Every structure is written in structure tokens, then in C-alpha cells.
């Protein structure tokens, strides 16, 4: 049946040949459907007499007979059901039962439920039908005619305005390493808001929290942490949080990094004879600055910035003096979209999109088939695990000094890096992913503890000049991965200069030259993969967290940081397969701010003084005195600071055992906390004095051991 539009009428014609052909022509697309004659059990060269008689009788009659039905303008405006009834009545007396079944099949295929199926199979059906018709039928099949669909248009987005919802709605995020993200339904409403609407939204959520208590909060978070470990079979018995021996302070390692900020190399300096040289007395002034103690009255902007649908919360507080609900200013950096996976926009980054498709092919993707009856699969040290093989391949080629052990990317072992060289471009690992048979619940996944959301973190603002920062409310051992830095993966050539303050460089042409040489050597027999790696090596990519990112975007700068970034791959070796995680360089005590070193150019970039206020601060009042110390004395400074935090932590634990060990703890964090009484505060001062006297002997013994 053919439909053509001429003037104000529509004409339908139905061919009455033995091979009925039904054609639908429209302005947008054209679809041809045909029915092949059924094959006879006899070969195609010897049809039965009945078949030959049928063919001859058909040929004697007019094979190309057609029934023409003309429908007026009024009838063409009728409903589709009425038009079909008109056609069926007209051809019912002229078609055989076989042709009627063909018409009925046309109506079924023309329904909305089958449209997509027809379009997806038309190509394969055309080729198979043409081959079958040429071998077993005297009537050749007619080719299917289709028009190409119009190119899909995407919205134009700005890097300075919220666009996370647009990218997700248009299915533009092609990050291959994304994992399931369970959010509260309100996240969709929030993502569609403008900046001003988000600011008003948080203003309505603000509350004044009175009688806040950091000691009680520390106890509750510790109880919730232990419950998570106990109830999770993949953690219970596999992961243990502990305060290690004295080497856990990482004093010497921290001294090497501190000297690097002074522009000095620890390994190239000659040994000094200290004689009577001692640690400067000014170091004692920095003890109180190690731990941030929140005030009793706080303004809570929100109890959960990332609108999670589980028990994990990331609250936001402002503790600036003199602020009220009416005077609180919510800056634009707080109006971001919280994400737990990097974003790759296939429209803006066509090179990355092409690399993702090549790396994700069945022959190039790296994922293991390891499985076990135990909750945690032992992929690490498994020579048959392709993910561990890739991890071992990268570890064996990481740059480090011969005297230090190479960093291991084990799930439950600390990421202890003893080399004084920068870790970022010299060390990279490989981890199992949720697409593996082990689902990432194995010993070869350094991001597993981050995905479990073990360690509680809060966002706070104590000084408007510094802005918002993050602090831990739990004790975190050295070498623990705690945060993944997420953002939108952007080519450095397109990154606006004003966005550099909220971006972190993921790859570098010069810094990753050694890495790309290794990967090209590995895939030299795979020309397609080799070419895309060669092209990627000419670009440097950034993680832009201006409008979408994770809680890691709030980590402030410090000249003596307690965290450092580290990179690892999943599934493949493109920048889109790379993840950036922050791990602790030293033991983190409850209340301690989590910081990074932004680099030597940070002060020049910001055009202002550094406000980290550490003893090694480049803008600090005692910078000259501490910068002239040698590495061993600086290491002793870090030991003293660690012991000061350790004494305070021990006192707090005894307070918790005395006053808070009995009582119900909520599953999620709830404000306000119960405050201390005057008696409790007096007892704490007495306990602190006694504990300090008792622990000073331990400190002197440990210091003497280190000097020896």
C-alpha cells in the first residue's frame, strides 16, 4: 500500500501481486515492508504443478493490478481508525487470505510499540531478505528506503553556572568509572535551581545550634564508625583502625616535605653538629592551632550538603564571630552540585569520548573474573588477576629511591610512602572496579574505604578570610585514603583562568611523560589504542570542581599539609579512567583540619598572604627561624606536635569513658549535643594535668630513642 499526498487528498494504492508490498511514505521517514513467498520443501528449480499453475494464472491476469482509493480532504482529517476501516472495506473483496494477513501485520508493525523494533532491525532484515529472495524466489525483494535522522542538538552550557542537571538529562556524561549514586529525591529539584535559588534554599535550611559539644560528637562518631565496621562483612575482620608505633607520625617524611617548601633538598644537605641547638620555643604557640574546637553556639547551614539517602552526612557550619541568621553570607562556592564520580562531557571533550570507546572495547577493557565465597576477594598478589597484573606493572615502574620500598595500592594496608620525591607524577596504581566479578570488594581497590564512607567529615568556616574548610571528627591513621577529588574532566586548553582556583591538574604532558611512554610500550601491538594514547599525551587535563565536585574541593592550603593526592586507574589507561584520591600523611586526630599543599605558586596566584598559620608558614612570623633548621630538628618539631595532639586525644578518651560511655547513640548525626557541666570542666582540667605528667615520661623515652 502506498500513500502519497497530492493537493488536498491522500491516495492509497495496494499492489495485488503474489508478493504484496506495503509502503508508507511520510515527510520524516519512509518504511518499506514486504513478505517473501514461503519456501517450498522442493528445490527452487522444481516447483509443484499447483505452484506453477498459480504463477501462470497470476501472470495471465494483470500482475500489476492495483486498487486505487482516493480519500477526500474531509476523510483525511478523520481519525486513524476510520481511515483504516475505509481501506479494509475497500480491499476486503479483492485480497486473498494471505494478503489480508499481510495487511494485518502491517497494522501491527505500524503501532507505536513496534516502531522502534522495526527501525532497529530493518538493516539486518534487508540484507537477509535480499539474499533469500535471490536464491529461493523468483520475485526479488525490494530494498528498504529510509531517511537519516536529524542530528541531536545539545544545550549550550557555561562553566560558570550550574550545568550538572543538563549534562545528566541529555546523557552527555560518559565517564566509564562511574558508580551507583543513591541520593534523596530532592537532589533533582536542587540541581535545576539557579545560584540565587540555591542561596535562598540554604538560607531557609539554616538553624542556630546551641550547646554544641565536640567531645560528645567525637564519641558518637566513634560509636557509629564501630557499628559500620561490625555490620559490614567486607570490613569486619579485614580493616582495623589503629594508632601505630612512633613511625606513624611520619616525622622524617614530613620534614622532607617541609624542607621542600623551603626550597631545600633533605638528601643533599650535609649533616650538622647540633651541639646545644634546640627546638625553638616558639613551637609551643602552635599547639593550640593543631585542633579546631567548635564553639558551643554554631549556625548550621545544612545537615547534609550532598543530600544523601543513607546515614552518611556532611553538615556545613559557620562559626565566625558575630554572625546571625540574618547576616550570614553564603558564597557561590557553597552552591555547587555534590558528585561522587567524575564527569566527562562527550560534547565538549570529543577526544576523551573517542578514547573511552576504544579503551572500553572488549579487547582493551581491564576487569577481572576473580570470585570467592569470602566477603572479600583476594585479588592482590593473585597472578591470574588482570587488575593486579596492571597494578604490579605500574608499581614496578614507579620512580623512587633504591633505599625505599615502593608504594603498594592495597585495599586495607596503609598507603605509606617513604620517598622524599613528590608522589603525584612518580606514583600511580590500578584498582579493581564495580564492573569486575569481585565488584571492587577485594584487596586490590585503594578506593574501597572511600566508597564505604567510613570517616565522618564536616565543612566549617571559622574565619571569613580563609573561607570554608573541612575537618575530621574521628581519629584517622596515617596512610588512609579518605576523600576522592571529583569534578568535570576538562582539557587544559579550554579551562578558563578564573576556574584554576577550583581545579586540580590530573595529567600533565611533561610530568606524565614517563607514564605515557610505558603505556605506549605496553600497547605497541595495538595501533588503535597506541594512537589514542599518543594523542592524549599531548594534552593536560584538569578536574574542574567549580560548579560540581566532592567535599575535597573544600580542603584548604597548608605549608605543612596532612594530606596528599594520589592517582590510580580503573578499567583502562585513559585520563577518563583515572581517579584522584587524598590520603593522610600522618595521624589525624578528631577536630584537626584536613589540608593540602597548593604549591609554591599559591601565594603568588592568590596575591595575598598565606593564612595557614603553621610553624612553617611562608607568611608566618617565625618563618625565618624555622626555615634555617636542618631536617632532623624539623622532624623533632613534628614529633612534638604529634605528641601534643596525642595527649589531648588521650584526655578526651578518658572523659568519654567517664561521662558518655553509657547511652544511646543515634544512627545519624543529630544536633544539638549535650554540653559539659561546670564539674565536668573542672574534672577535665585536673585530669589533663595528671595525664600530661604521666605521658611526659613516655614522650621523653620516645624522643631519646629517636635521637639514638
Swiss-Prot record:
Family annotation (SUPFAM superfamilies): SET domain
Tissues in which the UniProt entry reports expression: Broadly expressed in the nervous system, including head, body and tail neurons.
Enzyme Commission code(s) on record: 2.1.1.-, 2.1.1.366
Binding site for S-adenosyl-L-methionine: 598
UniProt key word Cell cycle: no
Enzyme class: transferase
Domain SET: 455-599
Keyword Nucleus: yes
GO MF term list: histone H3 methyltransferase activity; histone H3K9 dimethyltransferase activity; histone H3K9 trimethyltransferase activity; histone H3K9me2 methyltransferase activity
Catalytic function, reaction form: N(6)-methyl-L-lysyl(9)-[histone H3] + S-adenosyl-L-methionine = N(6),N(6)-dimethyl-L-lysyl(9)-[histone H3] + S-adenosyl-L-homocysteine + H(+); N(6),N(6)-dimethyl-L-lysyl(9)-[histone H3] + S-adenosyl-L-methionine = N(6),N(6),N(6)-trimethyl-L-lysyl(9)-[histone H3] + S-adenosyl-L-homocysteine + H(+)
Positions with biased composition (Low complexity): 54-63, 126-136
Domain of life assignment: Eukaryota
Region (Disordered) location: 36-63, 101-152
InterPro entries, A to Z: Class_V-like_SAM-MTase, SET_dom, SET_dom_sf
Knocked-out gene: effects: RNAi-mediated knockdown prevents age-related decline in the expression of bas-1, a serotonin (5-HT) and dopamine synthesizing enzyme (DOPA decarboxylase). RNAi-mediated knockdown improves behavioral performance in pharyngeal pumping in aged worms.
GO CC field: chromatin; nucleus
Pfam families, A to Z: SET
Location of this chain's protein in the cell: Nucleus; Chromosome
Alphabetical UniProt keywords: Chromosome, Methyltransferase, Nucleus, S-adenosyl-L-methionine, Transferase
GO BP terms in the entry: epigenetic regulation of gene expression; methylation
Sequence similarity: Belongs to the class V-like SAM-binding methyltransferase superfamily.
Biological function: Histone methyltransferase that specifically di- and trimethylates 'Lys-9' of histone H3 (H3K9me2 and H3K9me3, respectively); involved in positively modulating the rate of age-related behavioral deterioration. May repress the expression of mitochondrial function-related genes by occupying their promoter regions, working in concert with probable chromatin reader protein, baz-2. Involved in modulation of the mitochondrial unfolded protein response (UPR). Regulates level of expression of bas-1, a serotonin (5-HT) and dopamine synthesizing enzyme (DOPA decarboxylase).
Subunit structure: Interacts with baz-2.
Name of the protein in its database record: Histone-lysine N-methyltransferase set-6
Amino acid at each position: 500500500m502506498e500513500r502519497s499526498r497530492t493537493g488536498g487528498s491522500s491516495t492509497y494504492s495496494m499492489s495485488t501481486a503474489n508478493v504484496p508490498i506495503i509502503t508508507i511514505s511520510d515527510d520524516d521517514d519512509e518504511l518499506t515492508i514486504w513478505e517473501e513467498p514461503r519456501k517450498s520443501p522442493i528445490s527452487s528449480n522444481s516447483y509443484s504443478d499447483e505452484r506453477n499453475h498459480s504463477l501462470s494464472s497470476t501472470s495471465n491476469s494483470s500482475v500489476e493490478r492495483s486498487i486505487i482509493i482516493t480519500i477526500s480532504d474531509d476523510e483525511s482529517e478523520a481519525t486513524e481508525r476510520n481511515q483504516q476501516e475505509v481501506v479494509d472495506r475497500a480491499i476486503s473483496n479483492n485480497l486473498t487470505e494471505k494478503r489480508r494477513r499481510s495487511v494485518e501485520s502491517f497494522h501491527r508493525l505500524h503501532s507505536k510499540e513496534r516502531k522502534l523494533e522495526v527501525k532497529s532491525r530493518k538493516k539486518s532484515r534487508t540484507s537477509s531478505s535480499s539474499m533469500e529472495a535471490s536464491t529461493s524466489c523468483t520475485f526479488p525483494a525490494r530494498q528498504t528506503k529510509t531517511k537519516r535522522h536529524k542530528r541531536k542538538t545539545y544545550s549550550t552550557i557555561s562553566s560558570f553556572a550550574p550545568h550538572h542537571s543538563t549534562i545528566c538529562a541529555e546523557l552527555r556524561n560518559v565517564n566509564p568509572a562511574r558508580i551507583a549514586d543513591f541520593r534523596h529525591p530532592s537532589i533533582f529539584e536542587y540541581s535545576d535551581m539557579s545560584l540565587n535559588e540555591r542561596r535562598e534554599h540554604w538560607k531557609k535550611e539554616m538553624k542556630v545550634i546551641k550547646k554544641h559539644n565536640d567531645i560528645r560528637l567525637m564519641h558518637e562518631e566513634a560509636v557509629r564508625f564501630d557499628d559500620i565496621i561490625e555490620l559490614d562483612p567486607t570490613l569486619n575482620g579485614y580493616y582495623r583502625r589503629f594508632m601505630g608505633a612512633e613511625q606513624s607520625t611520619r616525622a622524617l617524611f614530613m620534614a622532607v616535605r617541609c624542607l621542600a617548601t623551603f626550597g631545600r633538598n633533605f638528601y643533599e644537605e650535609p649533616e650538622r653538629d647540633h651541639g646545644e641547638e634546640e627546638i625553638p620555643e616558639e613551637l609551643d604557640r602552635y599547639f593550640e592551632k593543631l585542633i579546631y574546637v567548635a564553639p558551643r553556639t554554631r549556625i548550621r547551614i545544612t545537615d547534609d550538603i550532598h543530600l544523601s539517602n543513607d546515614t552518611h552526612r556532611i553538615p556545613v557550619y559557620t562559626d565566625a564571630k558575630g554572625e546571625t541568621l540574618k547576616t550570614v553570607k553564603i558564597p557561590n562556592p557553597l552552591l555547587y552540585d555534590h558528585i561522587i564520580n567524575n564527569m566527562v562531557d562527550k560534547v565538549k571533550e570529543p577526544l576523551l569520548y573517542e578514547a573511552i570507546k576504544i579503551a572500553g572495547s572488549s579487547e582493551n577493557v581491564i576487569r577481572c573474573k576473580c570470585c570467592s565465597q569470602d566477603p572479600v576477594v583476594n585479588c592482590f598478589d593473585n597472578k591470574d588477576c588482570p587488575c593486579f597484573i596492571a597494578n604490579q606493572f605500574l608499581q614496578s615502574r614507579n620512580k623512587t629511591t633504591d633505599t625505599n620500598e615502593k608504594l603498594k595500592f592495597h585495599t586495607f594496608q596503609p598507603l605509606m610512602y617513604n620517598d622524599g620525591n613528590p608522589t603525584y607524577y612518580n606514583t600511580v596504581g590500578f584498582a579493581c572496579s564495580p564492573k569486575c566479578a569481585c565488584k571492587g570488594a577485594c584487596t586490590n581497590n585503594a578506593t574501597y574505604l572511600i566508597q564505604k564512607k567510613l570517616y565522618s567529615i564536616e565543612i566549617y568556616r571559622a574565619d571569613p578570610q580563609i573561607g570554608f574548610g573541612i575537618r575530621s571528627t574521628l581519629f584517622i591513621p596515617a596512610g588512609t585514603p579518605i576523600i576522592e577529588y571529583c569534578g568535570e574532566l576538562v582539557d587544559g586548553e579550554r579551562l578558563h583562568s578564573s576556574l584554576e582556583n577550583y581545579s586540580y591538574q590530573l595529567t600533565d604532558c611533561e610530568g606524565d611523560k614517563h607514564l605515557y611512554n610505558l603505556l605506549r610500550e605496553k600497547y605497541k601491538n595495538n595501533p588503535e589504542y597506541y594512537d589514542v594514547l599518543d594523542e592524549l599525551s599531548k594534552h593536560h587535563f584538569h578536574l574542574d570542581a567549580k560548579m560540581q565536585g566532592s567535599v575535597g574541593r573544600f580542603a584548604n592550603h597548608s605549608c605543612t599539609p596532612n594530606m596528599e593526592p594520589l592517582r590510580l586507574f580503573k578499567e583502562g589507561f585513559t585520563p577518563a579512567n583515572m581517579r584522584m584520591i587524598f590520603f593522610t600523611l600522618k595521624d589525624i586526630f578528631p577536630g584537626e583540619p584536613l589540608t593540602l599543599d597548593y604549591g609554591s605558586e599559591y601565594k603568588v596566584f592568590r596575591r595575598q598572604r598565606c593564612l595557614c598559620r603553621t610553624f612553617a608558614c611562608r607568611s608566618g612570623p617565625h618563618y625565618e627561624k624555622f626555615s634555617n633548621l636542618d631536617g632532623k630538628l624539623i622532624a623533632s618539631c613534628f614529633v612534638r606536635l604529634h605528641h601534643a595532639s596525642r595527649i589531648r586525644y588521650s584526655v578526651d578518651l578518658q572523659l568519654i569513658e567517664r561521662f558518655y560511655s553509657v547511652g544511646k547513640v543515634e544512627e545519624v548525626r543529630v544536633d544539638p549535643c549535650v554540653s559539659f557541666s561546670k564539674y565536668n570542666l573542672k574534672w577535665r582540667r585536673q585530669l589533663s594535668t595528671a595525664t600530661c605528667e604521666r605521658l611526659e615520661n613516655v614522650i621523653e623515652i620516645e624522643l631519646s630513642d629517636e635521637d639514638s
